């Protein structure tokens, strides 16, 4: 671009980042970018910050990186914000799919899984980075997680997913560009 050349425009402000608690660097980027692009260019994670998305398009992909949508011109992220509050996200620890110490692993690289752990409960977010339906087995390391999950459910998130109980994560099928949020206790 004309301001930062081949670098992300955020690099122009690197010296200010220690004084920032969230970034908003996804404007002008499409939600159809690659998984690596989301991590490096849009998420804020390389700078030790969380980012936000401009709108409510493909919220699952944003959630894989801890990104919530701002209150956009269209869409309604409030049910998702309420879910984070209900879960106690402010006290949770995030383990991204890239973290070697993550207690949750997906066997399909097109379906990365990020887990948020808060005491004896956890929330997994899985997003499909392809246009086609994908399947994955999600493996949970109970020792690393710190508890043995006994109940699994997909919470209802208005305009995002229907609520339902599920038996586990041995077989997850997710539509193209879709995703799922799962609670377990």
Question: Over which residues does each language-model region extend?
Answer:
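C-terminal beta-strand-rich structural cap/linker in extracellular carbohydrate-active enzymes
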Residues: 163-185
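Active-site-proximal substrate-binding groove within the catalytic cores of carbohydrate-active enzymes
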Residues: 1-151, 156, 178
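Solvent-exposed strand-loop boundary residues in beta-sheet-rich modules
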Residues: 158-161
């Amino acid at each position: 671009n004309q301001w930062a050349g081949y670098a992300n425009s955020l690099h122009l402000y690197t010296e200010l980042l220690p004084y920032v608690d969230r970034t908003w660097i996804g404007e002008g980027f499409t939600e159809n970018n690659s998984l690596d692009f989301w991590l490096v260019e849009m998420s804020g994670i390389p700078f030790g910050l969380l980012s936000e998305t401009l709108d409510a398009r493909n919220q699952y992909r944003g959630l894989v990186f801890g990104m919530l949508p701002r209150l956009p011109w269209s869409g309604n992220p409030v049910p998702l914000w309420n879910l984070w509050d209900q879960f106690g996200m402010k006290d949770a620890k995030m383990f991204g799919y890239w973290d070697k110490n993550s207690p949750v692993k997906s066997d399909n690289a097109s379906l990365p899984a990020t887990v948020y752990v808060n005491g004896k409960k956890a929330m997994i977010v899985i997003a499909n980075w392809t246009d086609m339906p994908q399947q994955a087995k999600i493996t949970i390391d109970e020792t690393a997680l710190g508890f043995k999950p006994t109940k699994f459910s997909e919470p209802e998130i208005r305009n995002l997913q229907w609520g339902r109980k599920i038996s586990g994560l041995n077989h997850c099928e997710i539509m193209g560009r879709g995703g799922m949020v799962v609670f377990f206790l």
